[in-house]
């Protein structure tokens, strides 16, 4: 089981936003700042377990679960396709009428339609493939603020170790901002 990003999002923090936050007026470090923008988004996604910005993902499973399919990186906005390899080794597409997307819960789930069972699959790895779109087109301001704080940290601290200084985490820093949208383990 695993998932991967098929189409990454447009970064919610633009290069102009980051430069303004960093108080940088020249373009000499644009490539580096661009790397930090992506790194900040990915760190926010990892911490919150949510997709930041609209993106297409693919989840692969070795078989259908007994219950619902838990889709990583909510909020899921659409299922593009749900395909599987049947017991004869033939790829099939499950009709949308055979399942429902639950977007109301804290995480997103694909649930079998009432009175149905998941189909049988070939006994092999990655035989169930769910392609879906996740993430809000416009992330909350708290996420953008957390990204800007992270970008600022990376800009000011270009090494993994700082000698001769005391580090203090801001009480209303990145984690406090991201906790407002984080998926907490149940």
Regions found by a protein language model. Name each.
Residues 1-186:
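Divalent metal-cofactor coordination and adjacent catalytic microenvironments
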